[in-house]
């Protein structure tokens, strides 16, 4: 015999009530957040990829230049920042790591970086120039 349970039965209402209470206590922000509005690209900064160059700008204002490291392995650009503070009151650590795959037409030998007084890290590289050229055909008459 198949027994159907009413959605309005006492145990279902109690289960729903307990789920609401424990969920809001365990995950108060995440549960009520609008998950459709998250924009993770804001964390990257500004990326420009046009005909002449590829560039990335990051806000690293919370880091000193000596806390930053930029490495290029093939076309993989890795940007890291690690900041550690120790005091008599405790220890804190702040870090980030970004990996960006550079486009194939970027001149990897010309990648450069600079940081502004405001803490904006700019990494850029020109695009490879088209090395093909037209070769004229000269007519040589035999004597």
From Swiss-Prot:
Keywords: Stress response. Belongs to the small heat shock protein (HSP20) family. Signal peptide: none annotated. Residues 35-140 form the sHSP domain. PANTHER family: HEAT SHOCK PROTEIN HSP-12.2-RELATED, HEAT SHOCK PROTEIN HSP-16.41-RELATED. This is Heat shock protein Hsp-16.48/Hsp-16.49. GO terms for biological process: determination of adult lifespan; endoplasmic reticulum unfolded protein response; IRE1-mediated unfolded protein response; protein refolding; response to heat. Gene3D superfamilies: 2.60.40.790. It holds the Pfam family HSP20. Transmembrane segments: none annotated. GO terms for molecular function: unfolded protein binding. One of its GO terms (cellular component) is cytoplasm.
């Amino acid at each position: 015999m198949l027994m159907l349970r009413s959605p309005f039965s006492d145990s279902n209402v109690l289960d729903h009530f307990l789920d609401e209470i424990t969920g809001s206590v365990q995950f108060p922000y995440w549960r009520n957040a609008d998950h459709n509005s998250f924009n993770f690209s804001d964390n990257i900064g500004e990326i420009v990829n046009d005909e002449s160059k590829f560039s990335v700008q990051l806000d690293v204002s919370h880091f000193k230049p000596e806390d930053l490291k930029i490495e290029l392995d093939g076309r993989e650009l890795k940007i890291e920042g690690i900041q550690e503070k120790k005091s008599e009151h405790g220890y804190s650590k702040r870090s980030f790591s970004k990996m960006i795959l550079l486009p194939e037409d970027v001149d990897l030998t010309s990648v450069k970086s600079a940081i502004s007084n405001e803490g904006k890290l700019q990494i850029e590289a020109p695009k490879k120039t088209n090395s093909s050229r037209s070769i004229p055909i000269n007519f040589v008459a035999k004597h």
